Amino acid sequence: MTELRVKMVESIADIDATTWNTCATSDGRFNPFLSHTFLQALETSGSVGGRTGWRPLHLLVEDDAGLVGVVPMYVKGNSQGEYVFDHGWADAWERAGGRYYPKLQAAVPFTPATGRRVLPVRDEPDLETALFSACQRVAEETGVSSLHMTFLTKAQWQHAGSLGCLQRIDQQFHWHNRDYASFEELLGQLTSKRRK
């Protein structure tokens, strides 16, 4: 692979939708939260950008052969809307004399759904590695405190770890609908203590 060219794009509208969606589905799966339409709706509605604490800085990565991939990226001025509770980290960092914000976040805003965060044009490990490297380079060049990638798939989480990234371990609870016909039927399956 030749030298990477990383474009930092402040609005997803400046990235061709077909290009973005090709990368977002290169693993053969459609994730609505990674679609160009969804991410653009967050921007045009004002849910991200401005004073929300989510400033878009999406990555478009190319080499001499063409497109390598894209990354949904945001400069974060706070920890709101991440569903990762790092306020304690921020407080400790600042008490120690550091500056926790701004930080760089590869994520889907307000969406604690597991999914890929580095999106290569083809589902190939070398391209994914190049995208992880591009993210690290952007973090260094922009002078943010740190780079965070939240709700990665297990495969991408392991890949990031193999590249030397620190791996956060957390716990999520998932609800599965067992074909309940109504909310009342669900409540009927719970003990009185759990029905609060």
Model-flagged regions — what are they?
Residues 1-196:
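N-acyltransferase acceptor-side catalytic subdomain
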